């Protein structure tokens, strides 16, 4: 199980990403637009740097919903490989069964 502080930190990052998403997208659009003057683009770069570091979506880490485990995460289910296996063995995941060949 992940520490509660790590889960809370990840939740905080998710909120920050949602809060600054529009502002970040607007600044990135200005930066990538070649028709805008160099000075305006540079100002946009500086403003983007002023935003909180955790407001970037690349700082987020996918974590298991049950345990908070960061490794072995399966996006389709939102669980780690361990918890997915346990749920599948109990028959809690519809359409998923143990492979045999």
Swiss-Prot record:
Entry's Gene Ontology molecular function annotations: rRNA binding; structural constituent of ribosome
Coiled-coil portions: none
Keyword Ribonucleoprotein appears in the UniProt entry: yes
Alphabetical list of Pfam families matching this protein: Ribosomal_S14 (PF00253)
Matches recorded under Gene3D superfamilies: 1.10.287.1480
InterPro entries documented for this protein: Ribosomal_uS14, Ribosomal_uS14_bac/plastid, Ribosomal_uS14_CS
GO biological process, one term: translation
Keyword terms of this UniProt record: Ribonucleoprotein, Ribosomal protein, RNA-binding, rRNA-binding
Gene Ontology terms: cellular component: cytoplasm; small ribosomal subunit
Function: Binds 16S rRNA, required for the assembly of 30S particles and may also be responsible for determining the conformation of the 16S rRNA at the A site.
Family: Belongs to the universal ribosomal protein uS14 family.
Assembly description: Part of the 30S ribosomal subunit. Contacts proteins S3 and S10.
Protein name as it appears in the record: Small ribosomal subunit protein uS14
Organism expressing this protein natively: Alteromonas mediterranea (strain DSM 17117 / CIP 110805 / LMG 28347 / Deep ecotype)
Classification of source organism: Bacteria, Pseudomonadati, Pseudomonadota, Gammaproteobacteria, Alteromonadales
